[in-house]
Amino acid sequence: MESLPRRVALLSVHTSPLHQPGTGDAGGMNVYIVELSRRLADLGIEVEIFTRATTGALPPAVDLAPGVLVRHVTAGPYEGLSKEDLPGQLCAFTSGVLRTEAMHEPGYYDLIHSHYWLSGQVGWLAKERWGVPLIHSMHTLGKVKNAALALGDDPEPTARLVGEDQVVDAADRLIANTDQEASELVRLYGADPGRVSTVNPGVDLDRFRPGDKRAARESVGLPPDAAVLLFVGRIQPLKAPDVLLRAAAELIAREPERREKLVVAVVGGPSGSGLAEPTHLHRLARRLGIADVVRFVKPVDQTRLADWYRAADIAVVPSYSESFGLVAIEAQACGTPVVAARVGGLATAVADGRSGTLVAGHDPGDYATAVAGLLDAPHRLADFGENAVEHAARFGWSATAAATADVYSRSIEDLRALRYRELCAGQ
């Protein structure tokens, strides 16, 4: 690729790649940014990640990996700001980004890649100042989320919806996680189809790989003969962990003998620090009469998470909205079949009927039926596990980085062509 950028400014305002996934606002996007940046660096592209400083304990710049630098930008108080408060800090954040670039020779950054709409607002202004292409990844779409709200969940604010429209108009190219997201950008936001590229996220196939289930269960403290259902993610209405708990209660109500061996593991934390106890789920488990089968586990690092995937019989992903669903791919890479909602990118992440089962809607009874259909058919469960590994192998991060770098190259070439046409027109 002749037009490969030398250096990219990658913007992630609201969540740092150094944060533990599963805590606060840290999740799949954090994993995405870390892994993509590392693989881009492997291709010879330097990456500088700008993120809001949330503690004074870290230096202004931290080396994440060879060729990958994390820059902490002071914008508002370190603590006490929710994601919804951050629009008020975008001017300060943008100022910090522009000051950093001004310390270098002009043309220091060849391209901007912003992640989530907040970062897109910053990228829009930086693009105008620096005269470089802006690539934007939404990760989630406010209009899509509002169309599929969970009970008790708050709708995305108008500021976000308007901000997303602005970013779609400003970006030179948009990267969608799946073809469905690409079509939603065109249909709901009026994006030019020629400026939308689909690049599937990836999975670390070295870390997330099949292994000995008995050893994994011993590692995480689970009985060797248990029937283990696993939920991984932030504990919030959007991710619908309550659907899994209600499905487990339905399983036991249908067949009380399942209680003896059933284990439901919930790995993750609520918004905020992510380390608080999910008291509402504890109460729900008690009310459903299944507190004895549910285990709540605070967020764990990626290596430990792989053990949880390998220890599980089935990973359950009942989200109301997912632009892709990294949890589903990670679980499958470890050889664990998935029962997931038929929403968004999960239809791409899961090979329905081969590596898992997609469920229409969020009726706990339907999830109970899907789970029982695998637990009660060991040969089918094993076949799904083998197929899951094969399916996940298509989603390595190196392929994601190569496709992303191609989008970068085309954007740089487009800008050069535009400038050449303008030069010719002015002569």
UniProtKB/Swiss-Prot annotation:
<dbReference type="InterPro" id="IPR017814">
    <property type="entry name" value="Mycothiol_biosynthesis_MshA"/>
</dbReference>
<feature type="binding site">
    <location>
        <position position="336"/>
    </location>
    <ligand>
        <name>Mg(2+)</name>
    </ligand>
</feature>
<feature type="binding site">
    <location>
        <position position="309"/>
    </location>
    <ligand>
        <name>Mg(2+)</name>
    </ligand>
</feature>
<feature type="binding site">
    <location>
        <position position="239"/>
    </location>
    <ligand>
        <name>UDP-N-acetyl-alpha-D-glucosamine</name>
    </ligand>
</feature>
<dbReference type="Pfam" id="PF00534">
    <property type="entry name" value="Glycos_transf_1"/>
</dbReference>
<feature type="binding site">
    <location>
        <begin position="25"/>
        <end position="30"/>
    </location>
    <ligand>
        <name>1D-myo-inositol 3-phosphate</name>
    </ligand>
</feature>
<feature type="binding site">
    <location>
        <position position="160"/>
    </location>
    <ligand>
        <name>1D-myo-inositol 3-phosphate</name>
    </ligand>
</feature>
<keyword id="KW-0328">Glycosyltransferase</keyword>
<dbReference type="GO" id="GO:0000287">
    <property type="term" value="F:magnesium ion binding"/>
</dbReference>
<dbReference type="GO" id="GO:0102710">
    <property type="term" value="F:D-inositol-3-phosphate glycosyltransferase activity"/>
</dbReference>
<keyword id="KW-0479">Metal-binding</keyword>
<comment type="subunit">
    <text>Homodimer.</text>
</comment>
<comment type="similarity">
    <text>Belongs to the glycosyltransferase group 1 family. MshA subfamily.</text>
</comment>
<feature type="binding site">
    <location>
        <position position="116"/>
    </location>
    <ligand>
        <name>1D-myo-inositol 3-phosphate</name>
    </ligand>
</feature>
<dbReference type="Pfam" id="PF13579">
    <property type="entry name" value="Glyco_trans_4_4"/>
</dbReference>
<feature type="binding site">
    <location>
        <position position="300"/>
    </location>
    <ligand>
        <name>UDP-N-acetyl-alpha-D-glucosamine</name>
    </ligand>
</feature>
<feature type="binding site">
    <location>
        <position position="140"/>
    </location>
    <ligand>
        <name>1D-myo-inositol 3-phosphate</name>
    </ligand>
</feature>
<feature type="binding site">
    <location>
        <position position="330"/>
    </location>
    <ligand>
        <name>UDP-N-acetyl-alpha-D-glucosamine</name>
    </ligand>
</feature>
<feature type="binding site">
    <location>
        <position position="310"/>
    </location>
    <ligand>
        <name>Mg(2+)</name>
    </ligand>
</feature>
<dbReference type="GO" id="GO:0010125">
    <property type="term" value="P:mycothiol biosynthetic process"/>
</dbReference>
<feature type="binding site">
    <location>
        <position position="322"/>
    </location>
    <ligand>
        <name>UDP-N-acetyl-alpha-D-glucosamine</name>
    </ligand>
</feature>
<feature type="binding site">
    <location>
        <position position="312"/>
    </location>
    <ligand>
        <name>Mg(2+)</name>
    </ligand>
</feature>
<feature type="binding site">
    <location>
        <position position="83"/>
    </location>
    <ligand>
        <name>1D-myo-inositol 3-phosphate</name>
    </ligand>
</feature>
<keyword id="KW-0460">Magnesium</keyword>
<dbReference type="GO" id="GO:0008375">
    <property type="term" value="F:acetylglucosaminyltransferase activity"/>
</dbReference>
<protein>
    <recommendedName>
        <fullName>D-inositol 3-phosphate glycosyltransferase 2</fullName>
        <ecNumber>2.4.1.250</ecNumber>
    </recommendedName>
</protein>
<feature type="binding site">
    <location>
        <position position="234"/>
    </location>
    <ligand>
        <name>UDP-N-acetyl-alpha-D-glucosamine</name>
    </ligand>
</feature>
<feature type="binding site">
    <location>
        <position position="14"/>
    </location>
    <ligand>
        <name>1D-myo-inositol 3-phosphate</name>
    </ligand>
</feature>
<feature type="binding site">
    <location>
        <position position="28"/>
    </location>
    <ligand>
        <name>UDP-N-acetyl-alpha-D-glucosamine</name>
    </ligand>
</feature>
<dbReference type="InterPro" id="IPR028098">
    <property type="entry name" value="Glyco_trans_4-like_N"/>
</dbReference>
<keyword id="KW-0808">Transferase</keyword>
<comment type="function">
    <text>Catalyzes the transfer of a N-acetyl-glucosamine moiety to 1D-myo-inositol 3-phosphate to produce 1D-myo-inositol 2-acetamido-2-deoxy-glucopyranoside 3-phosphate in the mycothiol biosynthesis pathway.</text>
</comment>
<dbReference type="InterPro" id="IPR001296">
    <property type="entry name" value="Glyco_trans_1"/>
</dbReference>
<feature type="binding site">
    <location>
        <begin position="20"/>
        <end position="21"/>
    </location>
    <ligand>
        <name>UDP-N-acetyl-alpha-D-glucosamine</name>
    </ligand>
</feature>
